[in-house]
């Protein structure tokens, strides 16, 4: 387990900033302690300094996971967020999409959000902006990328895609053997 390099930190923070913007500072400087990001087996973990000190006694090859997995770096050095980061990103999300109850199940099975399933969308959401997807009961379901801006969503065909699927809480069941 090692700290992220400058390049890895930049790539990861750019990806997270697509979803929470300048609220990224609130993620790092928390009132309940100091938190940091660490890399282990191409996966980035969000861990408290206190837990990091306790884990120093465990050898790297025996360590499976530590803290919360925020995502992983692909072989092409791009950062991909995991659904396990949802609990930390959802409270700080700038752009949100609420899906109707009938479209929740479709999204949780890994499908995109269609206009017919769109309940609400945050004003001034631009195209290709990172959004957090919520149920109408304000339960975070996952994240995606806005396929259309807020203005375009109003006048688009009901079967058009408005949010591209990225990750959802259904992955806990679908990929339980690979999530760490």
Swiss-Prot record:
<comment type="subunit">
    <text>Monomer. Interacts with pre-ribosome complex. May bind to RNA. Interacts with NOL8. Interacts with FTSJ3. Interacts with DDX24.</text>
</comment>
<dbReference type="Pfam" id="PF17833">
    <property type="entry name" value="pre-PUA_NIP7"/>
</dbReference>
<dbReference type="InterPro" id="IPR040598">
    <property type="entry name" value="NIP7_N"/>
</dbReference>
<dbReference type="GO" id="GO:0003723">
    <property type="term" value="F:RNA binding"/>
</dbReference>
<feature type="region of interest" description="C-terminal domain">
    <location>
        <begin position="93"/>
        <end position="180"/>
    </location>
</feature>
<dbReference type="GO" id="GO:0005654">
    <property type="term" value="C:nucleoplasm"/>
</dbReference>
<dbReference type="InterPro" id="IPR015947">
    <property type="entry name" value="PUA-like_sf"/>
</dbReference>
<dbReference type="InterPro" id="IPR036974">
    <property type="entry name" value="PUA_sf"/>
</dbReference>
<comment type="function">
    <text>Required for proper 34S pre-rRNA processing and 60S ribosome subunit assembly.</text>
</comment>
<keyword id="KW-0694">RNA-binding</keyword>
<dbReference type="Pfam" id="PF03657">
    <property type="entry name" value="UPF0113"/>
</dbReference>
<dbReference type="InterPro" id="IPR016686">
    <property type="entry name" value="Ribosomal_synth_fac_NIP7"/>
</dbReference>
<dbReference type="InterPro" id="IPR005155">
    <property type="entry name" value="UPF0113_PUA"/>
</dbReference>
<protein>
    <recommendedName>
        <fullName>60S ribosome subunit biogenesis protein NIP7 homolog</fullName>
    </recommendedName>
</protein>
<comment type="similarity">
    <text>Belongs to the NIP7 family.</text>
</comment>
<feature type="domain" description="PUA">
    <location>
        <begin position="94"/>
        <end position="170"/>
    </location>
</feature>
<feature type="region of interest" description="N-terminal domain">
    <location>
        <begin position="1"/>
        <end position="92"/>
    </location>
</feature>
<dbReference type="GO" id="GO:0042255">
    <property type="term" value="P:ribosome assembly"/>
</dbReference>
<dbReference type="InterPro" id="IPR055359">
    <property type="entry name" value="Nip7_N_euk"/>
</dbReference>
<keyword id="KW-0690">Ribosome biogenesis</keyword>
<dbReference type="GO" id="GO:0005730">
    <property type="term" value="C:nucleolus"/>
</dbReference>
<keyword id="KW-0539">Nucleus</keyword>
<dbReference type="GO" id="GO:0005829">
    <property type="term" value="C:cytosol"/>
</dbReference>
<dbReference type="InterPro" id="IPR002478">
    <property type="entry name" value="PUA"/>
</dbReference>
